[in-house]
């Protein structure tokens, strides 16, 4: 206990006192548990020990990183540790002090109450971690500089900075409002018959209720018949937290669809995330479906360039939201970007035509959360068998050696490939395309280039044609995504992966916001 008190003493008035008292009660509980003869005591002891270790690490970071820690944060910490103190005091009363040498059994009733307290402790740990995450990423007023870039105090730079700060504050509110134990997110099956049809170039299903004609979208997260219970429960935790994030998010600002909740279909070995259509939007199509449409190739580009830039910005913002919550997406591709047409206010043939593709791009949203996982969760490191998906993977993910587990910078590489496709308004999956499709195959044939050759081809496009198509700043963003933390950014590699990933995406967002057309 003394090590924690010494670590933060004098750094925050009021915080060390409540922390020391609270965690000393936790130590007292652990001493009393020694006298009990049940494996359950080991679980409770472990939770309390982890609680103390996490609190120690986080608090030392809070107050040693910046000596001017905001008073608001200090007040929040005092409130949080008062809650923790209440939990510990109730536990202390549940496990009376025994005489030396005595052994006591834990009754079923005591074990049941103990499990409830463990859930409360784990909830507290989760809430404390999220508050720490928000502080680490969003607690500083000054944003990090873009990699290989000097800050410019021009008009566009100031406006871009304000936009990024607005997004940062909005994400802060989302993370603060997310509760992984929220049970209301689970939708119960209803008896109304519905029809489900797959969206073209997508794993999503379009659902229509026969009576009300209400339409919504469903995304599946499946597990195998022989999955262990703990694997299924891990899926459940991820689905619940993703649903909560999407439920609380500002859909249009952040580029992710609002989620009504999820359904657990045990007979089908899957979870279903349910997404209603956003207001005044209709006719969803994946970006891949649009790019691969023969009509797109035949007629060419008819939408304004600024709309394509807005589409790119929305996708980057959506990825930032996911990374800020501590998740990796793992499938940043055009088939996981859903584009809605805007409904015409007064439908007529002319008005409707001008509000829809190809004259208008509509509104994009990032989808495809069926493989998303926490950034610190174990990675199966399975090879990708579909060549279309391989196009968007970084060389490290093809190599699959120790240390190549999927991380945030792999998402950022995939983002760079997607931004290339947006610039050319075509897809690398279109093998008939001389600009893109033929560049990823050897001699224009069916064999895909090696991962290293693909990266070189992408960089050549980013430095060659992209500046002419979208401007130099957009080209710089694409290059930054494809090169990741190379060169002068090597000094960031020793930092926490979550912090590096989110700071990097934040810098990319700022660079995109500086572009004016």
Language model: regions and residue ranges:
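N-terminal amphipathic alpha-helical segments
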Residues: 1-76
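Residue immediately N-terminal to the catalytic "proton-acceptor" Asp
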Residues: 325, 330-331, 335
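Protein kinase catalytic-loop region centered on the HRD/HxD motif
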Residues: 317-327
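Conserved structural core of kinase catalytic domains
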Residues: 257-308, 376-378, 382, 387
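Regulatory helix-to-disordered linker/tail regions at the edges of structured cores
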Residues: 34-37, 41-42, 82, 86-254, ...
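Activation segment/activation loop of eukaryotic-type protein kinase catalytic domains
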Residues: 335-396
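Conserved C-lobe activation region of Hanks-type protein kinase-like domains
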Residues: 399-471
């Amino acid at each position: 206990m003394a090590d924690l008190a010494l670590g933060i003493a004098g750094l925050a008035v009021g915080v060390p006192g409540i922390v020391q008292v609270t965690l000393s009660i936790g130590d007292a509980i652990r001493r009393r548990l020694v006298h009990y003869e049940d494996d359950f005591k080991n679980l409770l002891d472990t939770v309390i020990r982890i609680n103390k270790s996490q609190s120690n690490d986080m608090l030392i970071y809070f107050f040693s990183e910046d000596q001017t820690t905001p008073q608001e944060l200090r007040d929040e910490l005092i409130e949080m540790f008062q809650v923790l103190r209440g939990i510990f005091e109730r536990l202390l009363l549940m496990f009376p002090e025994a005489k030396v040498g005595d052994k006591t059994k834990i009754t079923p009733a005591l074990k049941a109450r103990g499990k409830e307290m463990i859930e409360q402790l784990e909830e507290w740990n989760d809430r404390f971690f999220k508050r720490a995450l928000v502080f680490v990423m969003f607690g500083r007023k000054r944003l990090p500089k873009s990699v290989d870039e000097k800050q410019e105090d021009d008009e566009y730079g100031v406006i871009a900075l304000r936009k990024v700060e607005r997004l940062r504050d909005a994400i802060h509110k989302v993370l603060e409002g997310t509760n992984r134990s929220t049970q209301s997110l689970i939708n119960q099956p209803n008896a109304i018959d519905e029809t489900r049809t797959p969206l073209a170039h997508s794993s999503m299903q379009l659902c229509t209720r026969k009576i009300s004609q209400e339409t919504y979208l469903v995304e599946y997260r499946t597990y195998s018949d022989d999955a262990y219970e703990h694997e299924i429960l891990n899926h459940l935790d991820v689905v619940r937290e993703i649903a909560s994030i999407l439920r609380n998010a500002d859909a249009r600002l952040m580029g992710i669809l609002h989620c009504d909740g999820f359904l657990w279909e045990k007979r089908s070995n899957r979870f279903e995330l349910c997404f209603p259509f956003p207001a005044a939007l209709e006719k969803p199509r994946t970006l891949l479906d649009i790019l691969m449409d023969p009509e797109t190739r035949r007629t060419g580009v008819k939408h304004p360039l600024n709309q394509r830039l807005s589409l790119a910005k929305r996708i980057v913002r959506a990825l930032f939201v996911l990374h800020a919550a501590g998740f990796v997406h793992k499938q940043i591709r055009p088939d996981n970007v859903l584009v809605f047409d805007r409904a015409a206010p007064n439908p007529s043939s002319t008005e409707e035509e001008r509000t829809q593709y190809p004259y208008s791009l509509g509104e994009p949203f990032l989808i495809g959360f069926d493989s998303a996982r926490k950034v610190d969760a174990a990675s199966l490191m399975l090879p990708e068998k579909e060549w279309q998906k391989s196009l968007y993977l970084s060389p490290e993910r093809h190599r699959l050696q120790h240390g190549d587990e999927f991380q945030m910078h792999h998402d950022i590489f995939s983002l760079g490939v997607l931004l290339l496709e947006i610039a050319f308004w075509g897809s690398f999956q279109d093998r008939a395309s001389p600009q893109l499709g033929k560049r990823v195959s050897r001699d224009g044939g069916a064999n895909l280039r090696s991962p290293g050759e693909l990266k070189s081809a992408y960089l050549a496009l980013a430095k060659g044609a992209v500046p002419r198509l979208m401007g130099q700043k957009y080209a710089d963003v694409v290059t930054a995504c494809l090169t990741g933390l190379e060169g002068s950014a090597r000094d960031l590699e020793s930092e926490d992966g979550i912090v590096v990933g989110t700071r990097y995406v934040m810098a990319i967002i700022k660079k995109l916001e500086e572009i004016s057309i």
